[in-house]
Amino acid sequence: MDFFGRHFDDILFHLQKMREKGKISDTIHRRGLGWPLADKGDLVMGVDTAVELGHPKEGSTAFLIWTREPMRLRNKRISVLGPDLHKLVGKRIPFGKIILLGVDGFNENNSYKRYRQLENVRYDIRLKGYMMRGVSQYGREWSRVSRSAIDDGFSFPILGGALVDRYLEFKFVKTVEVVFFTSGRRDMKPFLPIAENALKIIGAMNKMIEEVSYDCDTCEYSDICGEVEDLRALRRSLQKRGKTTDA
């Protein structure tokens, strides 16, 4: 199932425009960067923090989408729109992160389960000097980077590379791109409506599966289901499976 075709079109269009303006720094990840893992219980305390990304007072946007056309992506590309971490020391900044995945074999029976597996990856990234401070279902992500990590050369290519490696451990993921935004709200602005719409699709999937709710008349996601055929196909499949189970 391909819920996000239009979202990919829009994201790739805006990224290309920004590349043409020289606003984006791209690197291709190579395995074996060798950044140490965090020990269990490691924390980045406020006094040790060099950079705070996406503090609630500054705002953040983080989301993940996929396409059934893996070749649309440049595999293992990590893009940074704005300064890298060593240029942000002492700051608390608005932050954006987009994960773009090229996948294989998604259908109405497995799409949501696979999405949950992919979504959980951000909780699995445990790198020394990097700490996820908070996340939410509304596309927010707040993290900290320590002074010692910055001194040792921690960067977005290292963080992005860890994400790339982890996603590619799933056999159904064929290509990955990671995009980070650190230049402020103005450059993130074109992507915010895309994020909002994508998160509505995820919310609709969650309501159908976790709440087992198919009442379109009372559902707050009825408008988005009207726009996305694959959501309607998922709904029909779930209803059919429910009737089979009840029989």
Features from the language model and the residues they span:
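Charged, amphipathic alpha-helical stretches
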Residues: 1-67
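Surface-exposed polar/charged interaction patches
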Residues: 18-21, 91, 138, 170, ...
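N-terminal accessory interaction module
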Residues: 51-149
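Extended, amphipathic alpha-helical scaffolds
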Residues: 56-58, 70, 213, 218-220, ...
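Intrinsically disordered, low-complexity segments enriched in charged and polar residues
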Residues: 130, 136-139, 143-161, 217, ...
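A broadly conserved sequence feature marking short terminus-proximal activation segments
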Residues: 143-207, 217
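Cysteine-cluster motifs in flexible loop/terminal segments that predominantly coordinate metals
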Residues: 195-236
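Short microdomains enriched in Cys/His and/or Lys/Arg
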Residues: 231-247
